[in-house]
Amino acid sequence: MKHSRFYQTVVAIAMMLMGWLPSLAHDFEVDGICYNILSDNSVEVTYNGSSYNNDYEDVIIPETVTHDGSTYSVTSIGERAFYDSKLTSIKIPNSVTGIGNSAFAFCTSLTSLEIPNSVTSIGSYAFIECSSLASIEIPNGVTDIDERVFSFCTSLTSLEIPNSVTSIGSSAFYHCQGLTSIEIPDSVTSIGDYAFSGCSGLTSAVIGNGVTNIGERAFVYCSSLTSVEIRNGVTSIGVRMFEGCTSLTSVEIPNSVTCIDVEAFNMCTSLTSIEIPNSVTSIENHAFFNCTSLTNIEIPDSVTSIGSFAFDGCTSLSSVVIGNGVTSIGHYVFF
């Protein structure tokens, strides 16, 4: 609990510095829910100044609300609207198109959530540490899963990413320990740094054909990950991408990959075999460091450089074939 509160404080300070914390004032209140007027006919749900901790556990947001004789359409859930509230369930109407930054951050009791297909944007940190949320259906109109949207949603076991999504932001699913499998559709072109880092329950991952860029440490310490399918499109196995994936036994690297980057498979202690395609030209420092179960390796002629300590600590390695194209070998490659 102390760790959680400390983390909340750090996040709050970060949001203040980035200008994410809204004014505590609101234009009006109806049935215990506060609103800010956006235009002559639309409003957003907003923070009430002390969070909704003592007001509601089950919330149904109306499509329209009337104030001073004017009727407004509820079109968005504003930044930090339900931050650190004791909500257990919330129903969002079809009139809403956007969910703001940190809108439901630290709602640790939230178990049920309905997001309508009308929603096209979900802001950064929107559901961070909603630790009781078990499943979520992302609407088909959402194009970006922003940074840290679902970080520390430790009970999240079910997730479907729709074909509308083109990017997954940094740490989007960081430490979602209950997540067991993930399939990234072909529509996604980029996966941010640490996107699935620390998802210790994740056993399988499929990365779609559209992905060309995967950030650093995207799957670091996914300790239960046994299989990963990387389809053609990815050009680099990035820095520490699978570091500490201690259950990973084999990986098929696609022909689109040209570089196996620094510490890409560091401490993948169950990795017994890997096939390096002819597209790869460089294997960087510590790429397979401490892969203690790796028994053989064949480096194709396409590879021109092997970094220092690339296979250091591979204590079971009994067969090594180095291709004719290698012109540069670093220090202690097989130490």
Each model region followed by its residue ranges:
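Positively charged n-region of N-terminal signal peptides that target proteins for export
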Residues: 1-8
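Bacterial N-terminal signal peptides
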Residues: 10-20
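Structural signature of tandem-repeat unit edges
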Residues: 40-41, 54-76, 85-98, 108-121, ...
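Boundary at the C-terminal end of the N-terminal hydrophobic targeting segment
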Residues: 23-27, 32-34
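Consensus positions within tandem repeat domains that build extended binding/scaffold surfaces
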Residues: 78-81, 100-106, 123-128, 146-152, ...
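Generic recognition of long tandem-repeat/solenoid scaffolds
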Residues: 38-50
